[in-house]
Amino acid sequence: SLKKYKITKNYFLPLGKSLEYGNIKTNVNYANTLKLFSKYGSDVFYSGTIGEDIISTVRNVKVNPGKLSKIDLLNYEVKERNPVCSLYRKYKVCGMGPPSSGAITINQILGIVERYDLSKLGYNNSETWRIIGDASRLAFADRGKYIADSDFVDVPIDKLIDKKYLKFRSNKLETKMKIPEIKPGLILHKETNNYI
């Protein structure tokens, strides 16, 4: 929750409540962070003040503190990853591949809802939000089972964003009711085109 942490509470909930639609919010701290990067490069992150702030926050957070150290940042090596892309209607949607789960999950959600005309249903329609919510739950179930660091685990990216698989998963949304129990889909081997 945004209320848990003073910094997020102050930023996102000024005066104790969220901003109204149309309000403009600036982020001076983020602007200052970008200025530091432009002036000092990545060193400000790995061995400078930004890294020190991150380490302090991770180690001193009240809920589930971590053990991140300066050595961890200094020893970190950037790895380039192939993007994960999929078509949603006429748009090519791309994002970072594993170990990040974002691109796969977003492309799954979009693939699952693609058969629905959400604009026709309308933004304030409960059915629109049920479809989006259940599609998200299905994608997050797959994320929890199949997505990890591809340096250590074989992540079936192509199968997870396969149009036939996502159409099969979207069949679960036909109930007109919230899906009571969400389970990850069963990704089968190459020799079959069936999904469970």
Give the location of each predicted region.
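Internal maturation/activation junctions in enzymes
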Residues: G16, R115-I196
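A generic secondary-structure signal for well-formed alpha-helical elements
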Residues: F37, G41, F45, V58-K62, ...
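Solvent-exposed loop/turn segments at secondary-structure junctions
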Residues: P99-S101
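Protein kinase glycine-rich loop
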Residues: Q108
